[in-house]
Design a protein with these regions (language model features):
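Hydrophobic alpha-helical transmembrane segments of membrane proteins
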Residues: 1-77, 85-238
Length: 238
């Protein structure tokens, strides 16, 4: 459906153009004018970039992943009679959406952080965070898209603007904000202590790793629960 719909291609090209402009702004950003603050400012920008990448993911998934089930239209009955389970059907939608979203988001994050020249620790933390955020947001979009389908919609834009699409965006924004806090706070704590040449205490180390683990667990649970809820909703349609 995506390949046959010219309007979706045009919207995707527009999105890619905006991403290029976004990256260019990081490329020409001159933080060396404030040498005493450049290190701190770079890391702050990196955390802002993580949040922006999360919001970009939310925008992409609500536009291209959330309508995936609804795009089957009246032909969905064929899926129900096909020799595959509805779970396999929905997970195929998940993996199809995950790959491009993950590649685009990781590229956006890695390149922006490279242009900023941030600390290697924060580079790795951001890349790993994007991986887990992609799993959660694609799972959330696919699951809610199955729970609130609109098989009679004329185009994917109507699906994205439906009740389910609005609910997804609200939940996605809340998730991105929570994820940024769970990644940003411990990362800032670690970098602040390292800049001062002071080692983290044992309790602080546990707090840092607990925060990272909580973020990873929240992402996996969000994606898995959403997919499970979506499969159950499809099964109840019959």
């Amino acid at each position: 459906v995506f390949l046959r719909d010219v309007s979706q291609w045009s919207q995707l090209l527009l999105l890619l153009a905006l991403v290029l402009v976004y990256l260019y702004n990081f490329r020409v950003l001159d933080l060396e004018r404030v040498p005493y603050m450049s290190g701190i400012v770079k890391n702050v920008y990196a955390l802002i970039n993580l949040g922006m990448a999360g919001f970009v993911m939310a925008t992409i998934t609500v536009r291209f992943v959330f309508p995936a089930v609804s795009a089957e239209g009246a032909a969905f009955w064929i899926v129900r009679t096909a020799p595959i389970s509805l779970g396999d059907f929905l997970w195929s939608k998940f993996w199809t959406g995950l790959v491009p979203v993950l590649v685009l988001s990781e590229t956006l994050t890695v390149l922006a952080n490279q242009f900023l020249g941030i600390d290697p620790f924060l580079k790795v933390a951001s890349a790993v965070a994007i991986l887990f955020m992609s799993l959660a947001l694609v799972g959330l979009a696919t699951g809610l898209g199955a729970r609130y389908p609109r098989f009679n919609a004329e185009n994917p834009t109507q699906v994205a603007g439906s009740y389910g699409g609005v609910m997804f965006m609200i939940l996605a924004v809340l998730f991105v904000l929570i994820a940024c806090v769970l990644v940003g706070w411990p990362s800032s704590l670690y970098l602040w202590h390292r800049a001062r040449g002071v080692a983290l205490s044992s309790s602080q180390q546990w707090t840092v790793w607990l925060s990272f683990a909580t973020g990873a667990a929240l992402s996996l649970v969000t994606g898995w629960w959403s997919m499970r809820s979506g499969v159950r909703a499809l099964e109840e349609m019959g």
